[in-house]
């Protein structure tokens, strides 16, 4: 067994999220600055679970053991970040309108009020700046919404960072709730803290797979 989805219970009590943009900065004696970026971006996290009983801890420990340190990628949802702050909700359906190339930061969207796509959606603040989204079904990268998104007669314009990491096709779905990150453990060694009262504490670090 490997991969899979990190258990959702108990939920993380805190999550520290980092946006990483690998760059090389050169400072000349004149004070001029040169920056070379690698045109890639990834998220990394430090997450803490609440004190757990042995029964709560056991399935989490078993899951972590199957990952064999950083070897296998797995999916994780973060209760603090995996859901939109906007007014989109199930069964609203949002799809990409037309093909977009890797590097694009503005994405045209179509939206409907129902899964049958019988009625186009008009909704202010459908998505909010700071939301996290991804594209279905085979695009694992997670992006941040940079500007609020309104939908008028089924159309909307989405601004994201970073730019698209791969080309996307028209009709691909937008995931705005239950967003999952595809990640791997950062450390070879995983440490579980046994506390007074027979509770277990656990903090883990993981990084987005590109």
Report residues per predicted region.
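Extracellular/virion structural assembly segments
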Residues: 1-210
């Amino acid at each position: 067994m490997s991969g899979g989805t990190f258990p959702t219970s108990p939920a993380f009590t805190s999550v520290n999220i980092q946006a990483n943009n690998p760059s090389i900065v050169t400072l000349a004696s004149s004070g001029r600055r040169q920056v070379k970026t690698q045109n890639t971006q990834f998220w990394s996290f430090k997450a803490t679970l609440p004190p757990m009983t042995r029964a709560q801890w056991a399935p989490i420990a078993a899951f972590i053991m199957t990952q064999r340190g950083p070897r296998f990628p797995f999916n994780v949802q973060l209760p603090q970040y995996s859901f939109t702050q906007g007014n989109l909700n199930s069964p609203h359906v949002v799809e990409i309108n037309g093909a977009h190339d890797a590097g694009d930061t503005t994405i045209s969207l179509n939206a409907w009020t129902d899964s049958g796509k019988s009625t186009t959606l008009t909704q202010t603040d459908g998505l909010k700046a700071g939301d996290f989204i991804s594209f279905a079904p085979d695009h694992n990268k997670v992006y941040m919404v940079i500007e609020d998104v309104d939908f008028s007669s089924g159309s909307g314009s989405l601004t994201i960072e970073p730019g698209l990491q791969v080309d996307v096709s028209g009709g691909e779905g937008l995931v705005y709730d239950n967003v999952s990150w595809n990640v791997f453990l950062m450390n070879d060694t995983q440490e579980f803290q046994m506390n007074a009262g027979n509770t277990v504490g656990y903090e883990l670090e993981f990084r987005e797979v590109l």
